């Protein structure tokens, strides 16, 4: 089960959405939160930035890329619908986690990304990286444990690109 909500940033009850996210997580539901940037349109260039965060160091052994399954699946669906392209950006905050080229190729194969998908690893925090890469029609994120509605709105406003934020149900797995 997946719940979809669109957040009007001009009139938002952040506490309501924060509680809804907590309830969704507690009940193992999925959730897709669309936050439009006020002056941006979708699907003009057909470019999608998929931001993968907190990928576990043992992802190949466990076949688990963390809380990134729903966001990755959604990016694949939007890409197919738009006939677009995906830039998958792996945020690496963990200095112990290395992503050699073979791992990047393995992710591309195991997720079944389209051939034109570009996958890169970016060091640092999510917001500073999102502000650097403003070449997309939409940014797609996973909702990390400490991410509030206010933080999501801030990411959209700072990037000046509409955002889709996904809460995993922990029931889907994008890897094959």
Predicted feature locations:
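Membrane-embedded alpha-helical bundles that form conduits across membranes
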Residues: 1-176
